[in-house]
Amino acid sequence: MNQFKVISKFNPTGDQPKAIKSIAKGIEKREKFQTLIGVTGSGKTFTMANIIEKVQKPTLVLAHNKTLAAQLCSEFREFFPNNAVEYFVSYYDYYQPEAYVAQSDTYIEKDASINDEIDKLRHSATSALFERKDVIIVASVSCIYGLGNPEEYKKLTISLREGMEKDRDEIIKKLVEIQYERNDIDFSRGTFRVKGDVLDIFPASSSSKAVRVEFFGDEIDRIKEFDVLTGETITKLKHISIFPASHFATSKDRLEVAIKDIEEELEERVKELVSQDKILEAQRLKQRTNFDIEMMREVGYCTGIENYSRVLDGRAKGTPPQTLLDYFPQDFLLFIDESHVTLPQVKAMQAGDKSRKDSLVEYGFRLPCAYDNRPLTFKEFENKLNQVVFVSATPAKYELEYSTNTAEQVIRPTGLLDPEIIVKPVKGQIDDLYTSIQETIKRGFRILVTTLTKKMAEDLTDYLKEMGVKTRYLHSDIDTIERMKIIHDLRKGEFHVLVGINLLREGLDIPEVALVTILDADKEGFLRSETSLIQTVGRAARNSESKVIMYGDVITKSMEKTIKETNRRRKIQMEYNEEHGIVPKTIIKDIREVIQISDIAEERKEYDNLNEALKSYNNDIDKLIEKYEEEMKEAAQNLQFEKAAHLRDVIYKLKKDKETEL
């Protein structure tokens, strides 16, 4: 078995060794809940990696959005190049859930666009858990949604070994059962093709490698892994496991039992609706469910099969769905990153799902078993946990209340101090802000300004622009790519001041920022709570010359606690710096490194000029498609999904153009 091994040119320093030892010891002592309190820039991810190396447990890292999960996944892949580091997030690029609006008698059918690359990564994650122990999966809250039965998934796995006596047609039949499709022309993920005694299988967890099984009579003669694009053999295999092409794949026997259960539930529910004088609803439910049953009998699945997942799994009514957590061995470790944001997200998921299902069940669009295709409730989530480490600079009440051990990581290896906090009166705050901005710009740094309302942010942006200050406003309507472009431009000095309401989201740890100002800091509320203030102050913690100005006429409890906590952290870091002779120095990261997503728009222009590209390839459209396919796969492997998706669209256009020419 492969062991977790951190590969890094750095060794743990500052508070890291103490935190690693404390948390690892707690895990060995079977502590269920622990908290790692780590300030911005203290190297929490590196600490997490070292804890994983120490305890050697399969690990799930839970992040609160896809972007943060992708960042963490990239970092863990750097630390663990020889171990399986996987990415598991929602595979929907676009998702419109099924719903019924009774007031207007409007039925909204489920509409979704599935990202094929993310689906591949999800399959890669689940199959890795069955194949090895040294697995780290970085996931979003998508991991608390129903995923199909892991026991059934494992049972349906096809195991092929060199020299094994196996009928080719029997394997083909099994492949169809686990939802692989035969396609001798378009050989893609989740398909297989047959030519004489040769069976090629394109696993659901792969994007560029397929498996060739060669038969001699009823015996498997050879198994090879080959490159789908070139056809070249990569390696010869003694054994291969082919995992199902869908997490909801079900054996024929189980499906027959499930169909009987669905028919019984349908009969019961129809009687119930008729007794309530809901004749239309009863007829609708009968028609829709019978169609689904027919599809399941014919092809093994139907659209919206997840709504029958409880019946397919053979679970009792009201029992929790099987999720990614059930695919892990019992002795797994869970890190909840930015737990103060992630845990409330987990808590909120189930309520929204239930309210939508109520009308679907009531008006005869779905059977009541659809209720059990849902995210876990928070209580169910807790019950599935083994050992948890909450990671946050500002852990909430839940984390601190339940944790039996807390490790603090205040010292930054760079020696950087938490910024100095200055409180100034509200009267004349705009004039004072303008003066402070000018001083900071003269020193060559940038400024973040956080306001309480959208109106104030817009007015302040207009005012500063009128005063000749290069200013931009960051608001919630801006999409991810545009948002990242704004931060990229701020770092490059295209403008100097960024105004916003909530500047706490990831990606705003900008070393060039030397001034963070908080307007109306004394207005208690969500945006001026202790957690929000500490997080906002942290935005200035990447620069050795930074400071924070809070504008307020009174010092609220939240302000007082924030100032006290920041001063405590400054004192600890100053003592450490003095003891070790460290002079705090701003670490200026390469701009491309922090914000890879921002150049996608530029890269798109390059790919959109197809006429120029074709000229450079002597109008050989096939060669250009081949080049773009390689680049698309490389982008996807590097988690650059926007670039990969755009390349996919360009390839599709080229293929269409080729067909037109023919």
Curated annotation (Swiss-Prot):
Keywords: ATP-binding, Cytoplasm, DNA damage, DNA excision, DNA repair, Excision nuclease, Helicase, Hydrolase, Nucleotide-binding, SOS response
Domain UVR residues, every copy: 622-657
Domain annotation Helicase C-terminal: ranges: 429-595
Top-level lineage group: Bacteria
Binding positions for ATP per the UniProt entry: G38, V39, T40, G41, S42, G43, K44, T45
Description of its domains: The beta-hairpin motif is involved in DNA binding.
Entry's family note: Belongs to the UvrB family.
Record-given protein name: UvrABC system protein B
Protein source organism: Clostridium botulinum (strain ATCC 19397 / Type A)
